[in-house]
Every structure is written in C-alpha cells, then in structure tokens.
C-alpha cells in the first residue's frame, strides 16, 4: 500500500498548521477555529507500533494544530509533535490534502529538509512526528535582525538551494518557500518544512494551475493562472534573498491587491548599498518570464556563491546580533585569533566581511536604532496597558502564548559593585560581563577564554584571557572576581562548554545601561532587550521590542512568552498586568534619559 493510501483515512488540516520550531507557517497564537473537543493526551500512542511519546512543552499553534515537544518513552529521543484534532477536519478535501502532504513529506530524506519520523491517529487526533528545530525559523531571525550581513545570507541561501535541488530532483515543487517555512536546528542548519502546498510533477512539462502560495513570495505565473512548475520555487528564493539582504520583501505593501499588482508588473527596487553581484542574482531569479530564470541546479554556480565568503558555521549569537567577520576567512579559527583585534571603530561604521568587500548593513546598533527600539517598546506597552487586559469578563491568557518569541539572551544573574567597580552579570549562555563605572564593558565568553571589550566610544575588540595587553589586566582581574563570586554565591557550577565550529564569529549583546528602584533592577541590553527583575517576589519580565513580546517568569520560575498584541486581545492576569504597567514607566525612563550609555539615576 502506498503512502497516500495509508494516509487516506486521515483528516487533513490546512497548509498553515502550527509553527514554533515545527513545519507549518500559521501565526502562533492565532484564534482556533473551534474549541478542542477532547483534551490532548499526556502520552501519545502509535496503535500500530505501540511506540509511546511523552508530551512535553508547548511549541506553538495554528488554526487547526497545536505543536509540542515530544519524546520517545523508550529512547528519550526528542521530536516535534504536530497534533490535529479530527473534530476540526471533517471536509473531504482536507483529508485529501493531508494525505498528499504526508505522502510527499515522508518520501523525503535530506540534510536540509525537516525530517519526517512518523504519523498515526487515535479516535480524536492525528499525530505527525517531525524533526525538532529548536532555533525556530528564518522568520524569527528576520524579525530580530532585519537585514543580514552578506556572508550570513550566502550561508543560509546555499542550504536553501541544496534542499530545493533535492526536492526538484525528486519531482517535488514546494510552492510555499518563505522565511517561516525555513527552520533552523541547534547548529543553525536550514531545514525546509511545511509541505502543505507541495505538489509532485507527474510527467515532463506538466504545468500546475492551483492558485497557492504566500502573497509576498508568490510568482507572477501563479497569479496569472497560466500554469506553473519548478520555476516558482526559484522566484521564491529570489524573494527570500532580497529579504535577507535588504530587510524586507521586494513587493511588500500594506495592501494585498497592491502587492499582487507589483508582482505582476515586476515592480521592485534594489537599494544601492547591495553588492552588484548579489543584485544581479536577485534580478535573474525575479524575472517575470519563468523560462528566463536560472534553474535551481544553476544557482550555486553564480558568482554570488563562487566568489564570496561562506562561513562553514554560524554562532547562535547571530540570531540576535551580527557575527564578526573581522579577519580574513583563511584565518577564521580560534587558534589564529589575534589579541585585541579591533572589529569596529565607532558605532556607525559597517562590519567588514573580508578584505576588498563592502558590507552592509551597519553592524552595531546605533544610539538612534536603540532609541527606536525603546520607542517601539513604549508604544507596544502603552497599547496593551490601554486595553486594560486584566479587566475582562473572560481572560484567556493562554491564547496569547507564543513560544516562537522566546528570547535568545537574558541576564540570569547579577551582582552590584557599582560603588567601587561596576555591575557584573551573567547571560543565560553562561558568559559573564561587567559594565564598569567608566562606561567600558568586558565580556568573558562561555569557553572561559575568549573576551570581548567595548570601549566608551563603541569600539569592539577581541582578545583572550591568555593573550591580552597589560592595560586590561586590572579589568580582567575584576571580571574574574565577579565571575567567581557569582559561581560561588549565585550559580550552580556548570560543566565546561565545548567550543563549536562557528563560535569564533560570535559577538554577544552587552549590558548597555541599568538602574535600580526600590522595587526592581532594570537592565537594558544592546540587542534591544529590556529585563526587569522584581526584588520582592523574584518575578521577572524580559521584553523584546523586535518580537513585540514579553517573557514572564513567575514566583514558581515558570517561563512563559506572550505576544503583546495577543495579550491586548485575550487579556491577562492581574499580576502580569500590573508588571506591564510598571514596565511602561521604566521604559519611558530609559527613553527620556540622556545618560543612557551607563547607569541611570534611580528615582
């Protein structure tokens, strides 16, 4: 029996099934079409194999599916479980579509395609077991970073192309390639997912007629309904490349009709700062005539890929701030790191990629950009507070949860010696930093040797504990004092972290400014994150203006992330509402201060 036949009795959810690190591109937190008829079981049992999966933490949801981390009860291997209630899947065409999605996806196995492990059903639910992509998708990366550096774009695009080459060799057209369907694992490898709109080409020259895709990435031949084939994926990759380098999609407008009109007219412009070689490849892929576009198998031979530096790996830190390409690729390894290698002189200079290459965008957040993030956050908090989220007849706080917005970095511990030296802190990745009273900053990475030094004017330098100038000896000694104090008094001793390939490109966000009130300490990181630790009950807020989200850590140390706009819609408990009101006042204080480069005076 073939896969489609096996899956035939399964009801099918729409193509926009869940998100949050699993295939599917529905917006997490979107309203569910109808209440779940049954509660999702704690243990999922495959009736055929009797294999059991234990349901873990919530990952996200879409219109018809909820997604959870699940683990094999025997092997303890962890997967993403996409769970679709049958009560919402009653129409015959939904059954057909799910059968097709499962049939296509389970036939695929490639390094850059989300792994398909299992599917089964019980009387109430359909369960799909997929590879877990812990680092979410390129959509979250885009929201945090906007435009990427050119080496990063090459790194991601090369993997997208390799995955798509595999699909096309197997006669599969994805038809919905976009940032939200390009997932990232712990090693920041791209995994193509969500095959809800995918189709199989049955014979050479077949042209599909179905109108499908996502507005910003949809090819003109799909809109014209004249028939389409593999070329639509190349068009989508062109849109993705533009978005990664420019920071927004090429045809995006606030009006769907206008977006479609621009696509049909091929009306877009490439900013002047984009490398001409990159601009040329974008133009080749975004040609109205599908036959004029390069095939997926020709793309990697383009000069953009053959002449430019492609990192072998990228550090996790680049999910939130640009990596450093401060030395030539031939010496990009930890052993060749020069002491006090200057990355960036001044806050507005662009990060160099490699000698003779111009690189955009600006590497470090300018003061204007940081103030813009704070302004956005103030507006977001003003809006949610004005809605009086705790004063509802029915508060559905759980509907606002969106784990895809979980912060990459936050302050896990801190110690205040500002009367003499400064504020010491530890980030969640076990790196340790000090914001000194002279407004300089020193960060020790979690490998215990690599150091990042930021001067008052924003110049970033890189050195090591074993190789540094004498002028920094005192600060390194103080940093070690802070580190030892936090290890002994505040932290559990952690195992040494083995350096991974790509870590030599890491740059960490640093503590930009902080202040204390009677109630809390307020910490503002250089990546835009604002953290508030409340003294009395040890609750915490971690606010991200780029994701428009808040993470709330309650007295029990439960860690939940919500989209602010959804809290506005669904409401929240009084405890969270009062802290959001307080947060708005603190962000206003951060924004109005003129001395935001170091410690603010507490009121």
Swiss-Prot record:
Which InterPro entries would you find in this protein's record? Answer: Kinase-like_dom_sf, PLK1_cat, POLO_box_1, POLO_box_2, POLO_box_dom, POLO_box_dom_sf, Prot_kinase_dom, Protein_kinase_ATP_BS
Where does this chain carry the motif D-box that targets the protein for proteasomal degradation in anaphase? 337-340
Give residues for the crosslink Glycyl lysine isopeptide (Lys-Gly) (interchain with G-Cter in ubiquitin).
19, 492
Catalytic reaction annotation: L-seryl-[protein] + ATP = O-phospho-L-seryl-[protein] + ADP + H(+); L-threonyl-[protein] + ATP = O-phospho-L-threonyl-[protein] + ADP + H(+)
Give every Protein kinase domain span.
53-305
Q: In which tissues is it expressed?
A: Newborn and adult spleen, fetal and newborn kidney, liver, brain, thymus and adult bone marrow, thymus, ovary and testes.
Q: How is its activity regulated?
A: Activated by phosphorylation of Thr-210 by AURKA; phosphorylation by AURKA is enhanced by BORA. Once activated, activity is stimulated by binding target proteins. Binding of target proteins has no effect on the non-activated kinase. Several inhibitors targeting PLKs are currently in development and are under investigation in a growing number of clinical trials, such as BI 2536, an ATP-competitive PLK1 inhibitor or BI 6727, a dihydropteridinone that specifically inhibits the catalytic activity of PLK1.
Region of interest called Important for interaction with phosphorylated proteins, as start-end residue ranges on this chain: 538-540
According to UniProt, the name of this protein is Serine/threonine-protein kinase PLK1
Name the source organism: Mus musculus (Mouse)
- Print the organism lineage: Eukaryota, Metazoa, Chordata, Craniata, Vertebrata
Tell me the gene name: Plk1
